[in-house]
A protein has these predicted regions:
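Pre-recognition alpha-helix immediately N-terminal to the DNA-recognition helix
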Residues: 21, 47-50, 109
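Alpha-helical structural segments
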Residues: 21, 25, 53-55, 66, ...
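N-terminal helix-turn-helix DNA-binding core of bacterial DNA-binding proteins
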Residues: 28-73, 84, 156
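N-terminal leader segment of winged-helix/HTH proteins
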Residues: 1-40, 158, 162
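Charged, amphipathic alpha-helical coiled-coil/dimerization segments
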Residues: 79-142
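Residue-level recognition of alpha-helical structural elements
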Residues: 8-15, 37, 64, 70, ...
Length: 162
């Protein structure tokens, strides 16, 4: 095989390695930002709240799919989040068999608090990177988030209530 055929693979490997390294940093930041709410919600429950904050009210099947859990698991998790007043359920007007769940004010406050802590720590880290490199990073991370199907920060819904 020629070195030409290996070059894209080696470049790809270096990109994957760099993203893995950065992901370790971001996982640590995420873990620290969740520490204050660890007794209130699990990581999967928090991810559920984030999905509702970013995508708005969801039916249980769509929510289960977005979070990556079985529908029965999503139902039990939503039961717990309803009891904690972090989400609420409402029956669809057009089809009373369909339930939609949405954040409550308390749920939105929890997501905002965790996101605020995460934002502060990421800002502190970013202050260590030269401004011109930050611009390149913004573009690259935006593409990464888009490729992964993540809703951009500026597009998070403000209509989180049912």
């Amino acid at each position: 095989m020629s070195s030409k055929s290996h070059a894209p693979s080696e470049a790809h490997d270096s990109v994957v390695d760099a993203v893995l390294s950065a992901s370790r940093v971001l996982v640590a930041v995420a873990a620290r930002s969740l520490a204050d709410v660890a007794e209130e919600v699990t990581l999967t429950q928090y991810r559920t709240l984030v999905v509702l904050a970013s995508r708005g009210p969801q039916n249980l099947a769509g929510l289960a799919d977005a979070v990556g859990v079985a529908p029965a698991t999503a139902t039990r998790m939503c039961d717990r989040l309803v009891r904690k007043d972090l989400i609420r359920r409402r029956t669809e007007r057009d089809d009373r068999r369909q339930l939609r769940v949405a954040l409550t004010v308390k749920g939105r406050s929890l997501v905002d608090a965790v996101t605020g802590r995460r934002r502060q720590e990421i800002a502190r880290i970013m202050n260590e990177i030269p401004v011109e490199q930050q611009a390149v990073l913004v573009q690259a991370l935006g593409r990464l988030a888009s490729a992964a199907g993540e809703v951009p920060e500026q597009d998070w819904t403000t209509g989180w209530d049912l």
